[in-house]
Curated annotation (Swiss-Prot):
The keyword Aminoacyl-tRNA synthetase does not apply. It is a multi-pass membrane protein. Its main location: mitochondrion. This is Uncharacterized protein YER181C, mitochondrial.
Length: 107
């Protein structure tokens, strides 16, 4: 009984850890949509994807900062981890998450 209780506790903790970033991302997207509607309503929305670009950059930067040791062990396993700095390790990050959107002006 105690083993099942511990196992369910581990599963719940795992679900909470996985669910928190998704909840944060959903709330950020809601705030982004509200801000875009307000800006569009008063007519000063100049950059269509600018806010989305900033949020994506911050989200993926925080993701890699939180998972930095895991990312380093996967991507640079042949190098000692204590010799790598963040600027050296950022070279090894996947390029698919570093796509920058071109800013477009709406007239």
């Amino acid at each position: 009984m105690l083993i099942l209780l511990r196992l369910s506790e581990v599963c719940v903790n795992f679900v909470i850890i996985i669910g928190i970033p998704l909840l944060i991302e959903a709330s950020i997207l809601c705030i982004q949509n509200i801000l875009e509607l307000l800006l569009k309503g008063i007519g000063i929305l100049k950059f269509n994807r600018y806010l989305h670009t900033i949020i994506l950059r911050l989200f993926f930067l925080s993701f890699y900062m939180l998972h930095f040791p895991i990312t380093l062990s996967i991507l640079a396993f042949q190098l000692p981890l204590n010799l790598l700095t963040l600027s050296q390790a950022s070279f090894h990050l996947p390029r698919s998450h570093m796509i920058l959107y071109q800013q477009q002006e709406c007239y």
